[in-house]
């Protein structure tokens, strides 16, 4: 049964991977071609020990489609977010909820919402949030431990920019971690591998005889598919939510890792 089901997912996986590749190639309304980072790029970054904090910040400006970015001490982040929320902002994540959904950053921003995109969990390389319309994107990077990278949209609302600047430190004063480049590169490679594995697991569950429903943004049948293909870059994240036929209305979550997808499926079946 397991081997047959694993073999049956191949067509679905090809469709999903094809979409991810199209998105990475810039074939989406977000136009995010220049923010895609491959595993090779990440590995190269790991060897670049001469990077400065200023260069790290510039990297995030490019990835998120921002106009500028600042480093804010972690100890000030909650206070900064509280100030922004008090001023009418809404903090969102590109992937949220159970079952998982893609936040329509582009649509909500166009409708007039002031959005702060927290991309620390999914990784900034997956979401050009500022280009999509978020006023700010909050990211983290192992090369600058103790800080978050706060990216500001081009033509950022003045009071929002002022709130960020009030908490920010000059990048020139921040020292790069000696091991941070390798850690950050490894984290990015791991996130992409987990996303790839999740695509396989989602397609597998969609064929599973005991599964009633599956939610994964990379499946063509998913309600978030159109939004995902236009607003995410290089993958659809690690979260796969599913519902057993014997437990209608009860969602369960599978969080993929960077382990081989087949191994994860086998372990899932053993536990299930």
Describe the residue ranges of each PLM region.
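Conserved C-terminal alpha-helix-loop-beta "cap" of PLP-dependent enzymes
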Residues: 199, 203-272
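Long, intrinsically disordered low-complexity tandem-repeat segments
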Residues: 35-53
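Conserved PLP-enzyme active-site core in the AAT-like
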Residues: 2-21, 32, 52-209, 215, ...
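Residue-identity detector for glycine
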Residues: 26, 30-31, 40
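Residue-level detector of solvent-exposed, low-hydrophobicity positions
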Residues: 28, 44, 51, 232-234
């Amino acid at each position: 049964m397991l081997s047959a089901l694993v073999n049956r997912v191949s067509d679905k996986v090809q469709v999903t991977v094809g979409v991810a590749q199209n998105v990475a190639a810039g074939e989406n309304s977000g136009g995010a071609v220049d923010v895609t980072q491959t595993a090779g790029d990440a590995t190269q970054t790991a060897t670049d020990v001469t990077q400065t904090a200023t260069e790290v910040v510039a990297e995030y400006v490019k990835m998120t489609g921002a106009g500028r970015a600042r480093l804010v001490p972690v100890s000030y982040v909650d206070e900064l977010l509280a100030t922004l929320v008090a001023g009418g902002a809404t903090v969102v994540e590109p992937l949220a909820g159970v079952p998982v959904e893609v936040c329509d950053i582009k649509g909500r921003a166009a409708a007039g919402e002031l959005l702060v995109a927290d991309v620390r969990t999914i990784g900034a390389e997956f979401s050009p949030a500022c280009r999509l319309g978020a006023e700010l994107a909050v990211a983290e990077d192992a090369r600058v431990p103790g800080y978050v990278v706060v990216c500001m949209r081009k033509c950022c609302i003045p009071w929002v920019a002022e709130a960020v600047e009030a908490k920010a430190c000059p990048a020139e004063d921040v020292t790069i971690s000696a091991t941070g480049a390798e850690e950050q590169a490894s984290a990015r490679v791991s996130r992409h591998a987990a996303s790839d594995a999740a695509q396989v697991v989602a397609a597998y569950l969609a064929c599973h005889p005991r599964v009633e429903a599956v939610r994964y943004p990379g499946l063509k049948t998913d309600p978030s598919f159109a939004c995902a293909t236009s607003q995410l870059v290089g993958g659809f994240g690690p979260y796969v939510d599913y519902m057993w036929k014997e437990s209608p209305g009860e969602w369960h979550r599978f969080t993929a890792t960077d382990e081989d997808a087949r191994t994860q499926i086998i372990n899932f079946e053993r536990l299930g």
